[in-house]
Design a protein with these regions (language model features):
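Alpha/beta enzyme core
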Residues: 1-47, 51-62, 66-152
């Protein structure tokens, strides 16, 4: 998986300022491209036929101290179908102020995904206030899996 979905919260990352120039040549080395619909539509040529994992949530930017407070649906399952996405990615903030809302978003995406046969990738977000510990990842991955994420 080539994931280039970080710009929607971080802005341009060094080396990825021009995704249309940087990402397209890398596509042949990846099975799946994970990005927002805007990045896919504007940067991936129609001749590229990789599977797509559509970033389906939006979050607060890095300018906000607690990024988990901005979580919501950025693209619904019908948008994923129009984009011919093979899966959707839902970010969850375990331990953050927006945990409950992000988990509800995950559950709703799982329900919609099951209706249309589209799997849901549960993404664990480690924000500024969260530690990247084994305990955190064990809890986060277990919660996302038990709530129905197809993969984490």
């Amino acid at each position: 998986m080539l994931a280039f979905d970080h710009g929607y919260i971080m802005g341009a990352t060094a080396g990825l300022e021009r995704m249309d120039v940087t990402i397209a040549p890398l596509c042949r080395y990846a099975d799946v491209l994970m990005a927002t619909r805007g990045a896919i539509r504007s940067c991936i040529p129609p001749t590229v036929h990789n599977a797509i994992c559509l970033r389906a949530t939006h979050d607060a930017s890095v300018l906000i101290d607690d990024m988990s407070t901005g979580n919501g649906v950025g693209a619904d399952m019908e948008a994923a179908i129009r984009m011919n996405a093979s899966a959707v990615a839902i970010q969850c903030f375990i331990g953050g102020a927006g945990e409950a809302r992000s988990l509800e978003t995950l559950c709703r995406a799982v329900d919609a995904g099951e209706r249309y046969g589209i799997p849901v990738l549960g993404v664990t977000a480690v924000g500024k206030e969260m530690a990247r510990t084994t305990q955190y990842f064990l809890l986060a991955t277990r919660m996302l899996a038990e709530l129905g994420a197809s993969f984490v």
